[in-house]
Amino acid sequence: MNLRPMPATTVSAQARPTPKSVTVFCGAMPGRGTKYGQLAEGMGRAIARSKLRLVYGGARVGLMGTLANAALDSGGTVVGVIPESFTAIPEAAHHGLTELHVVHDMHQRKALMAELGDAFIALPGGVGTAEEFFEVLTWSHLGLHNKPCVLLNDNEYYRPLLSYIEHAAVEGFITPATRSRVIVCKDIEGAIAAIRSP
């Protein structure tokens, strides 16, 4: 990924290309109950049906594994990116993917996931998911890309995070332009439509 900032006027003037790949951030744990797994499964199927390539963190556990398996079972193309240290953990890496990129560390993982995706969607997850989303949002703020950044706020999962964003904006730490880059969707259909919006 070219990490040289572009002028903000250039980024804002760029038309978004029709996405061919979507990078999805989500938890390496399943979460409480079945609703999160069902959401990840639905997203995987929707991405495959939409003829989009799924890029994700390369694990076979938690929501990540559910997401990938659903896309694969629906005939989709799935690309995983995982740090080499994780490959030593039994059952961590998903070896049934279309492609699995093994990189040196977490920094390379995030950079390659960002480079390979034309859009970003965050499903429920923990601190790693939040970090990944905020990193690509920050890169958008800095003019490094013009890719849509979507929070899938199913069942108000991200309400506390959105409250933080609003509070930081009110207190002058997040600009209105950056706040507007956070695309909030309530369901899978809305998220897919959002990343395809010009």
From Swiss-Prot:
Keywords: Cytokinin biosynthesis, Hydrolase, Plasmid. Substrate binds at E91, R109, K110, G126, V127, G128, T129, A130, E131, E132, T138. One of its GO terms (molecular function) is cytokinin riboside 5'-monophosphate phosphoribohydrolase activity. GO terms for cellular component: cytosol. It catalyses: N(6)-(dimethylallyl)adenosine 5'-phosphate + H2O = N(6)-dimethylallyladenine + D-ribose 5-phosphate; 9-ribosyl-trans-zeatin 5'-phosphate + H2O = trans-zeatin + D-ribose 5-phosphate. The keyword Hydrolase applies. It comes from the Bacteria. Induction: During the interaction with host plants. GO terms for biological process: cytokinin biosynthetic process. Catalyzes the hydrolytic removal of ribose 5'-monophosphate from nitrogen N6-modified adenosines, the final step of bioactive cytokinin synthesis. Belongs to the LOG family. This is Cytokinin riboside 5'-monophosphate phosphoribohydrolase. It comes from Rhodococcoides fascians.
